[in-house]
């Protein structure tokens, strides 16, 4: 964590734990302020997509079903589903984090990586000094499988 005066920038689990103990409170969320930025992305070579479209589609369909399950569940249910991934985080803290994410509309309900989100991601990477040359959306992003997953 970074401490600046009486403010600090820390992970949600730590911020929520402090908040629940009455030792602090969350005043802003980077996720809420930034807009939709993909936290996780999957990549494959074009040759793999062409050689194994059924495998790729099955994988994307499973991810889409997971996103639908999350969007149809309560924060308490989601916290129980993901608890094994966060063994160091108390279930009440995890539920509070999930509730905040739900209230902020942090999670999309589909896997389509929009051009706006792609531009925003490149803006962030460029401002952070991690990107020197931008790439065209059409050159790097394939939404074909995500769109088909929504049709099933």
What are these regions (language model features)?
Residues 22-25, 41, 87:
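N-terminal secretory/targeting leader peptides
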